[in-house]
């Protein structure tokens, strides 16, 4: 299991000015194993909000980049299924290992995890309601047939003050037991698309 904690930015909480997000990825015992930093433009953050194009650099404890996420600008809407979200996952940077691609559905958020050759491996299926008052929002990781859940991504409730004054999110990932390390990186990428 991996926990992803988005750092709360004081400037963002006080002024509402959207800054580049930063994250800490921790193991189940709370030890920091990676950090992630967003790279995006001020204009994109202001004009496109959460749909902005961005790159995320995931670095190990020594500061060496180990995973690189690239998300192009896409507009998403249940009315416009032609511009769905997509994220490319590279590890090492410059070498594509997979993709997270949104699948169109009018009511339920669905994403497909693909290999570097764009072959589907797993699906991530969210709830009909994306927000929950005072509770976690769970996304089920399922095989392609969607017959059962093999893992979970949980968008964790962070408390009323943090939920009201910031857009900082915390995620928990429970990986399928026999999942390839490349697909684990792609599943981590899914958290940054949700």
Give the role of each language-model region.
Residues 1-64, 71-86, 92-96, 102-194:
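Low-complexity or membrane-interfacial segments used for flexible interactions
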């Amino acid at each position: 299991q991996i926990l992803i904690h988005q750092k709360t930015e004081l400037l963002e909480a006080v002024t509402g000015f959207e800054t580049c997000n930063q994250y800490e990825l921790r193991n189940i015992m709370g030890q920091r194993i990676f950090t992630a930093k967003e790279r995006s433009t001020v204009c994109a953050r202001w004009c496109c909000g959460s749909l902005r194009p961005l790159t995320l650099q995931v670095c190990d404890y020594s500061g060496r980049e180990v995973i690189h996420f690239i998300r192009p600008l896409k507009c998403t809407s249940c009315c416009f299924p032609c511009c769905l979200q997509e994220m490319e996952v590279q590890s090492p940077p410059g070498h594509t290992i997979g993709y997270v691609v949104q699948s169109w559905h009018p009511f339920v958020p669905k994403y497909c995890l693909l290999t570097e050759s764009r072959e589907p491996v797993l699906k991530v299926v969210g709830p009909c309601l994306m927000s929950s008052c005072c509770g976690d929002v769970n996304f089920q990781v399922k095989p392609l047939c969607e017959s059962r859940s093999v893992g979970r991504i949980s968008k964790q409730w962070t408390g009323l003050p943090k939920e009201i004054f910031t857009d900082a999110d915390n995620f928990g990932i429970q990986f399928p037991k026999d999942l390839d390390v490349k697909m684990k990186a792609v599943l981590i990428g899914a958290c940054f698309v949700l």
